[in-house]
Amino acid sequence: MDMGSKEALMESPPDYSAAPRGRFGIPCCPVHLKRLLIVVVVVVLVVVVIVGALLMGLHMSQKHTEMVLEMSIGAPEVQQRLALSEWAGTTATFPIGSTGIVTCDYQRLLIAYKPAPGTCCYLMKMAPDSIPSLEALARKFQANPAEPPTQRGQDKGPAAGPASSGGELAFLGAAVSTLCGEVPLIYI
């Protein structure tokens, strides 16, 4: 090797790095086509968002119109059915301070109250036209003394005894059966 070529390489070594192509690595497209592509993508995204918002608004408007029309034609019984249809298939469990737990089963229209000591469980049928408030339930259940049936007398029959198997409480639903499964039931 010639000494002159070594010195030339040392003074200016070859550059093996890739040539800069800009931010986006599309080698076959010129810059003006890249910009046009970006603008088209942004416009399409904006159109999709606007169309989605319009369709969602149209759906909400249609549901509202159907509900108003059904309520005006059907009067109170439709309003009652609509109010209960929102709650159908749901249960709600509420603590009443430190004194007990209330479970409302809106599908079976049952209300269960278990006092804090857990000696018994009160069951009450809920009227479909008037769902009581939590304050009214607390007053009603706390007005009844939370005594076990042995102290109140065994006049309640088999419904006052503790449930011996899970099949006996199947008609109550899962939430109420779990709450009242191990204690005697008292129907109000």
From Swiss-Prot:
An example GO CC term for this entry is: alveolar lamellar body
Compartment annotation: Secreted, Extracellular space, Surface film
Q: Which residues form the BRICHOS domain?
A: 94-188
Where in the chain are disulfide-linked cysteines found?
Answer: C121-C180
**Would the keyword Endoplasmic reticulum turn up in this protein's UniProt record?**
no
Q: What biological-process terms (Gene Ontology) are attached? A: respiratory gaseous exchange by respiratory system
Q: Does the keyword Isomerase apply?
A: no
Q: Which residues form the propeptide?
A: 1-23, 59-188
List residues with covalent lipid attachment of type S-palmitoyl cysteine: C28, C29
Arranged from A to Z, the UniProt key words for this protein are: Disulfide bond, Gaseous exchange, Lipoprotein, Palmitate, Secreted, Surface film
- Tell me the segments the record calls region Disordered: 144-164
Other noteworthy facts: Pulmonary surfactant consists of 90% lipid and 10% protein. There are 4 surfactant-associated proteins: 2 collagenous, carbohydrate-binding glycoproteins (SP-A and SP-D) and 2 small hydrophobic proteins (SP-B and SP-C).
The job of this chain, per UniProt, is described as: Pulmonary surfactant associated proteins promote alveolar stability by lowering the surface tension at the air-liquid interface in the peripheral air spaces.
Q: What is this protein called?
A: Surfactant protein C
Q: Which source organism?
A: Oryctolagus cuniculus
